[in-house]
Curated annotation (Swiss-Prot):
Residue ranges with Polar residues bias: 48-58
Chain spans, region Interaction with P-TEFb: 199-202
Modified residues (Phosphoserine): 98, 103, 230, 234, 249, 257
Protein name: Protein HEXIM1
Matching Pfam families: HEXIM
Gene that specifies this protein: Hexim1
Length: 356
């Protein structure tokens, strides 16, 4: 009976010392700067003993030694007299812990864990809190760098496109004029750069022919044509006059023929320029010599035609003189005929009384 009472009497001040040491340790930890707590890692394998790493058995199976080696340094610092308490119990009781020592060690393990666990959790939360605070602005910066803020407003001047078949007649006319001006400008730029260009494919002459007003069939507004033609007017002249009045064989009038002639001349000039650009130096020299020969032939022919025209001009003057002489003789003949008629009438008239 004396031994249990003595052991209980010895336990009371020891537990009080243990709790007091824990309180002092917490006060010291509170006085420590926060930087010291941040330096302590959560889990460090360097504090584990080699025996615990080598042994594959659970803690508590090998006795008190295994438990002491597996405890972290925070637990031993929090309660340094725990090992002394266990040694005192072993020395006072004199019992062998190999058989029944598992239960005290097992009971002591949760106690030590319960004593040390609050401090460990508080340190872990203190370590995690500043790390999260550091990661939050860094993540915001990364998101800002990755995603660009949209600072532009949508433009109010939107181009309202409409298909061609939905345009009105005025809009179609403006669109066609704009396209024709643009095409002519582009063709002029390309031609100035020396690039081959195709003729502007337009159907405006068809539209002009289609838009022509119907002729007014009221005959009262037009002057009547002479019913009879003079003798010197031939049928060919009549056909030519009719063709001119109708606007030509193509039905386009004078403006259409001028447009076609201008288009043909432009196309021929472009084709000729392209052919000269594609020719080599020898071919150009040969072409130049041929053109000189052709020019000399044309000049000779022109001189010959001029001489002939001069001769024909002299013949024409003679013919004109003869025509004038003929007219004069005809007039004189008519005058003689009239005089002869008067003499005949006088001869046929009866003699007067005065003459008898």
């Amino acid at each position: 009976m004396a031994e249990p009472l003595l052991s209980e009497h010895q336990h009371q001040p020891q537990t009080s010392n243990c709790t007091g040491a824990a309180v002092v340790h917490e006060e010291q930890n509170s006085e420590r700067p926060p930087s010291a707590e941040e330096r302590v890692p959560k889990e460090d394998s360097r504090w584990q003993s080699r025996a615990s790493l080598q042994s594959g058995s659970r803690p508590g199976q090998e006795g008190d030694g295994g438990l002491k080696h597996q405890l972290p340094p925070l637990q031993t610092n929090a309660c340094p007299e725990l090992s002394c308490l266990e040694k005192g119990e072993k020395g006072q009781n004199g019992e062998d812990l190999s058989t029944g020592g598992a239960s005290p060690s097992a009971e002591g393990e949760p106690m030590s864990e319960s004593l040390v666990q609050p401090g460990h959790d508080s340190e872990a939360t203190k370590l995690e809190a500043p790390v999260a605070g550091v990661e939050e602005p860094w993540g915001q910066q990364q998101r800002q760098l990755g995603k660009k803020k949209h600072r532009r407003r949508p433009s109010k001047k939107k181009r309202h496109w409409k298909p061609y078949y939905k345009l009105t007649w005025e809009e179609k006319k403006k669109f066609d004029e704009k396209q024709s001006l643009r095409a002519s400008r582009v063709r002029a730029e390309m031609f100035a750069k020396g690039q081959p260009v195709a003729p502007y494919n337009t159907t405006q002459f068809l539209m002009d022919d289609h838009d022509q007003e119907e002729p007014d069939l009221k005959t009262g507004l037009y002057p009547k044509r002479a019913a009879a033609k003079s003798d010197d007017t031939s049928d060919e002249d009549f056909v030519e006059e009719a063709g001119e009045e109708d606007g030509g064989s193509d039905g386009m009038g004078g403006d259409g023929s001028e447009f076609l002639q201008r288009d043909f001349s432009e196309t021929y000039e472009r084709y000729h320029a392209e052919s000269l650009q594609n020719m080599s130096k020898q071919e150009l020299i040969k072409e130049y010599l041929e053109l000189e020969k052709c020019l000399s032939r044309k000049e000779d022919e022109n001189n010959r035609l001029r001489l002939e025209s001069k001769r024909l001009g002299g013949v024409d003057a003679r013919v004109r003189e003869l025509e004038l002489e003929l007219d004069r003789l005809r007039a004189e003949n008519r005058q003689l005929l009239t005089e002869n008629e008067l003499h005949r009438q006088q001869e046929r008239a009866p003699p007067s009384k005065f003459g008898d």
